Amino acid sequence: MPKKLILKNFLSPGDIVMLTAAVRDLHKCHPNQFVTDVRTPCPQLWENNPYLTPLDEKTPEVTALKCEYPLIHRSNSLPVHFLHGFVEFLNEQLKLQIRLSAFKGDIHLSEKEKAWFSQVREIAGEDIPFWIVVAGGKRDFTIKWWDLWRFQEVVNYFRGRILFVQVGAREHHHPALQGVLDLRGKTDLRQLVRLIYHAQGVLCPVTFPMHLAAAVEVKGGGPKNRPCVVIAGGREPSQWEAYPHHQYIHTNGALWCCDDGGCWKSRTVKLGDGDSKDKPDNLCVDVVGTLPRCMDMITAQDVCRRIKLYFDGGVLPFLTRAQAELTRSFVSRARFIDHERK
């Protein structure tokens, strides 16, 4: 009789993408031994998942397990990825031998979803290649933010060659870029999954869309793995976060504060919100202006070069002249003022 499990985790969407991989490989490595369901804040990430069966936690034969990933506390010194976190936890808790079958999470789109027009096509009237850009992040982890003006430099550099689509949750910090298609606050989790399915590439810090870039199926006609450029700095050890086909720009080993893995700090300055992230041991020790030095060391030119690699290598084409002309009719003309910049 298969063991009935409800796996629980109530952390951020990026963490839940990691859990999807563990569920996938629980069933692949131990077929017909488990019936699984989940309890997470992100039910949209589990839509069409073939490994889930609705279970009632009140049923006596059902075991509920709060899933964690204590492996993170050894990530600075071990050759392990975030994907291994829940896998190791389940192995220890259930006495199993789960092994990762793929270097990515497990997000499933239906054939109907894949046939729908993207939000970009709905606006443009035709399919246009585009990159998703995330130029901010959650307000509680300011150490992950890069300079808005540098994001703008990147957008400006590729103007007429790449259409950038800016996304971000309304409740998070995502200041407006100029010359982009602005979809900030206009995508729920499932819409973001579908948008990434259609995307040519992703530009972001270490965040949820980075994990989706790897986990979401690549639309036919493109490379086998979706291009993604990640502005990472030195907060996390690179081996814990980076995917093989991404351009992951990190500074591990270049600064004393991250010379032996990541610093795992949370903020550059106190926010006064009562959160433990305001404690001195959670604050960056090397701040340049408003940025941690590890992020300040990464220039717009560094990022442009990494994006351009995908085009120079031939796996991606730039916009055609006609496509570039079409984008001018709907990209954002938003202006922004940074009062801290002189």
Can you annotate each of these PLM segments?
Residues 1-342:
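Catalytic machinery of carbohydrate-active enzymes
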